[in-house]
Amino acid sequence: MTRTLQAVANPFADLDLDRLRRRTSAKWRYYPEDALPLWVAEMDADIAPPIIAAVTDALELGDTGYALGHACARAMAGFAVDHWGWTFDPDATANVTDVMTGIVDLVRLVSPADEAIVLTPPVYPPFYGVAKKLGRTVVPARLGPDDRLDSASLEAAFAEATAGGRGAVLLLSNPHNPTGTVHSRAELDEVARLARHHGVRVISDEIHAPLIMPTSTFVPYLAASDTGPDLAVASASKGWNLAGFKAAVIIPGADAGPDLEPLRQPGGGHPGHIGLIAHAAAWADGGPWLDAAIAGIDANRHALADLLREHLPAARYTPPESTYLAWIDCRALGLGDDPAAAFLERGRVALSSGIPFGDGGAGHVRLNLATSPAILADAVARMASAHTTTAA
């Protein structure tokens, strides 16, 4: 079904930095006020009006009890059909507190304690935290030089992880954080083929799936071939800036439904009712706002290329195909393995260090594009000042 959507203005076009500094979330409170924060994945935009309305209505009604049902998954299912041409059964899903909680639960449920976790570095640092929390060995399958999944690397990692007849789990970032790569259907088909051959279960983190740039097409992992034993975890958290309203949905492959039964029982780690209301409103009615946000991010990702070309021409950067995260190779700037530290100390701009992303992360930074053009320009100017100070 195609919905008629009303245009919304770019939510990043005109942001008041003083107003942003009144926020008390991690992005704006972790570093001192003289540092410009473009690190953690929070947007600087205001929340989409349909979400504000849905949450306000619930609060005014006193609808603040326990969560029940699959309304959020049903709203997501409508979005998935409209935007990705993909269908899934919302009644087969399970609600969880957030994506990472869901991933920890799934690894425990589908994988014995002695099995390894395969990761595709450089990749989202909390994936390593899952392995540490559960006492698992990490087997890396490094991305290729083009920042895409590498079939040979996956084949070798799967073989190593499953040596001796064990199984293993692949934590897939789809689309990929931090590079913003959107995996193609052919690439996902190959992941599934290799996983089936080696007895690997795939858990796909699709939290950034709503944030696909106009030149790319997102393919849900479970839409690929032969993904029956696998699972995906999705959330409106990143697409609509709802990290403070925790909620996520686990979607099982065709054969994985029984694995979710323990998560449906009372007493588990379920999301709050208001969080599910906020996320359902995002999936169902947040499309126009999301389109405007993507247009703003699209403009910023290209503006960053121009700014770096002007102020830091030795930095290497390819505009991401998705997310609002820019992965910048700073190795030629002479700032060492952790250029984020130099940018913070000498330029007072806070970026994410590439080191925690694992293999291939040293010498890189991750920059948050979900801000105003003026703040983005200020950030690059601060980076350039830090580089000049270091060179001197």
Residue ranges and their predicted role:
Residues P145-T217:
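Active-site phosphate-binding strand-loop segment of PLP-dependent enzymes
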Residues L134, H197-H198, G228, G347:
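Helix C-cap/helix->beta junction micro-motif
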Residues A280, I297-A305, Y317-C330:
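Conserved glycine-rich beta-strand-loop-beta hairpin in the small C-terminal domain of fold type I
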Residues L38, V55, M76, T93, ...:
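Generic structural signal for small/hydrophobic residues in well-ordered secondary structure
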Residues A223-D298, H387-T388:
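Conserved core segment of the aminotransferase class I/II
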Residues R108-A168, L172:
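PLP-dependent aminotransferase-like
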Residues G78, D338, A342-L351, F357-A392:
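PLP-dependent enzyme catalytic core of the Aspartate aminotransferase-like
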Residues T2-D98, D105, A284, A392:
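N-terminal small-domain helix-loop-helix segment of the aminotransferase-like
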